[in-house]
UniProtKB/Swiss-Prot annotation:
PANTHER family: DNA-DIRECTED RNA POLYMERASE I,II,III (PTHR13946), DNA-DIRECTED RNA POLYMERASE II SUBUNIT RPB11 (PTHR13946:SF16). It comes from the Eukaryota. Belongs to the archaeal Rpo11/eukaryotic RPB11/RPC19 RNA polymerase subunit family. It is found in: Nucleus. Keywords: DNA-directed RNA polymerase, Nucleus, Transcription. GO terms for cellular component: RNA polymerase II, core complex. It comes from Homo sapiens (Human). The lineage of its organism: Eukaryota, Metazoa, Chordata, Craniata, Vertebrata. CDD domains: RNAP_II_RPB11. This is DNA-directed RNA polymerase II subunit RPB11-b2. InterPro entries: RBP11, RBP11-like, RBP11-like_dimer, RNA_pol_Rpb11_13-16kDa_CS, Rpo11-like. DNA-dependent RNA polymerase catalyzes the transcription of DNA into RNA using the four ribonucleoside triphosphates as substrates. Component of RNA polymerase II which synthesizes mRNA precursors and many functional non-coding RNAs. Pol II is the central component of the basal RNA polymerase II transcription machinery. It is composed of mobile elements that move relative to each other. RPB11 is part of the core element with the central large cleft. One of its GO terms (molecular function) is DNA binding. The keyword Nucleotidyltransferase does not apply.
Length: 115
């Protein structure tokens, strides 16, 4: 069969998680390739990027169902770098998800479902 080995969907070596390439087709844009991820992460990062008023375009694609990577394209205003927008989006997501986890744990404490 032509399917890749199962371990390829999650095994990742040092320094292979993300690559950043400048997009030469449009000004002030970058392509972020994130390995071993899928639509779940791509959509949440894209949505967070679009909340930033200095981001002109944010989109993602999965090149092929058998390739375990996503490509996120980000274009920003001239005074704001795509790398800075991406870093800010990730930082904001970490904060939001930490708050969600904290509130979830607070709701579960009265039910004694947590150790």
């Amino acid at each position: 069969m032509n399917a890749p080995p199962a371990f390829e969907s999650f095994l990742l070596f040092e320094g292979e998680k993300i690559t950043i390439n400048k997009d030469t087709k449009v000004p002030n844009a970058c392509l972020f390739t994130i390995n071993k991820e899928d639509h779940t992460l791509g959509n949440i990062i894209k949505s967070q990027l679009l909340k930033d008023p200095q981001v002109l375009f944010a989109g993602y694609k999965v090149p092929h169902p058998l390739e375990h990577k996503i490509i996120i394209r980000v274009q920003t205003t001239p005074d704001y770098s795509p790398q800075e927008a991406f870093t800010n989006a990730i930082t904001d997501l970490i904060s939001e998800l930490s708050l969600l986890e904290e509130r979830f744990r607070t709701c579960l404490l009265p039910l004694r479902l947590l150790p």
